[in-house]
Curated annotation (Swiss-Prot):
Catalytic activity: N-formyl-L-kynurenine + H2O = L-kynurenine + formate + H(+)
Any one Gene Ontology BP term: anthranilate metabolic process
Active-site feature positions: 60
Protein name: Kynurenine formamidase
Taxonomy of the source species: Bacteria, Bacillati, Bacillota, Bacilli, Bacillales
Residues at which Zn(2+) 2 binds: 56, 161, 173
Top-tier EC class: hydrolase
Provenance organism: Bacillus thuringiensis (strain Al Hakam)
EC nos: 3.5.1.9
Residues annotated as binding substrate: 20
Length: 209
C-alpha cells in the first residue's frame, strides 16, 4: 500500500510575508555570493520568531517560563485531528463540546478567517481561557490555529496563552488549513533547537492516517 504523501501546512517565508505591527520584518538576502566566495552562495536571514508558522514557548509571555530548548519535542510529532470552527468570533469549551475529541492529543482548528500570509489581519477569532481545562481533560497536549495568535490581537493579558500552558498544552500558530479536509493526520511541527528563544519557526506538515 502506498504511503500517504506529506502535505505542507506552513506559510512560505519570503520578503512579502506579514509580520506583527512594529515587529521585525522578514528579510532574506544573499550576503556572500558565489561570485564573491568563489564556491557558494551564503544567505542572511532576519526575522521575528513569531513570523509565519511558529510555536510559542512560555518565555514568550512569562519571564520565568520555559524556553524553546526546554520543551518536549515529542509534543510536536504524532497524531493530530483537524476540525472546522469557522465563522466564530471566539472558541471555548462550549464550541468544542460537540466534537468527538476522545483520544486526541493534538488538535488543529480551522477558522477560515483570514488565510492571506502577506496581509496581517485586523481581527481574528480567539480562544477563550475556558478552553484550556477542557482540552486538558481530553488529554490534548497541543493546540494549533490558522491565525497569528490564540488571543485577541490587541490583548495584553494573554489569558489563553497563560491558561493553555498552565494546563500543559503547547501552542502552534499560523498553520495553513484551507487546502486540507477535516480528519485525522500525522503531524510534524518541530521547533529549532534555540537555547534562549521565546518561540521558533516550524515547517509544519501532515499526512492522512
Amino acid at each position: 500500500m502506498k504511503t500517504s504523501e506529506w502535505i505542507d501546512i506552513s506559510q512560505p517565508l519570503n520578503n512579502d510575508i506579514a509580520t506583527w505591527p512594529g515587529d521585525t520584518p522578514f528579510s532574506y538576502e544573499v550576503s556572500w555570493s558565489k561570485e564573491e566566495s568563489g564556491s557558494v552562495n551564503v544567505g542572511k536571514l532576519t526575522m521575528s520568531i513569531h513570523t509565519g508558522t511558529h510555536i510559542d514557548a512560555p518565555f514568550h509571555f512569562d519571564n520565568e517560563g520555559k524556553k524553546v530548548i526546554d520543551l518536549d519535542v515529542q509534543v510536536y510529532v504524532g497524531p493530530a485531528r483537524i476540525i472546522d470552527v469557522s465563522n466564530l468570533e471566539s472558541i471555548g469549551k462550549k464550541e468544542l463540546e460537540k466534537f468527538h475529541l476522545e483520544g486526541v492529543e493534538r488538535l488543529l482548528l480551522r477558522t477560515s478567517s483570514h488565510g492571506k500570509a502577506n496581509e496581517f489581519p485586523d481581527i481574528i477569532p480567539h480562544l477563550r481561557a475556558d478552553i484550556a481545562p477542557f482540552l486538558s481533560e481530553k488529554g490534548i497536549r497541543l493546540i494549533g490555529v490558522d491565525v497569528p495568535s490564540v488571543d485577541p490581537l490587541d490583548d495584553k493579558e494573554l489569558a489563553a496563552h497563560h491558561q493553555l500552558f498552565k494546563h500543559g498544552i503547547h501552542i502552534l500558530e499560523n498553520v495553513v488549513l484551507d487546502h486540507v479536509a477535516d480528519g485525522d493526520y500525522e503531524l510534524i511541527a518541530l521547533p529549532l533547537a534555540l537555547s534562549d528563544a521565546d518561540g521558533s519557526p516550524v515547517r509544519a506538515v501532515i499526512r492522512p492516517i
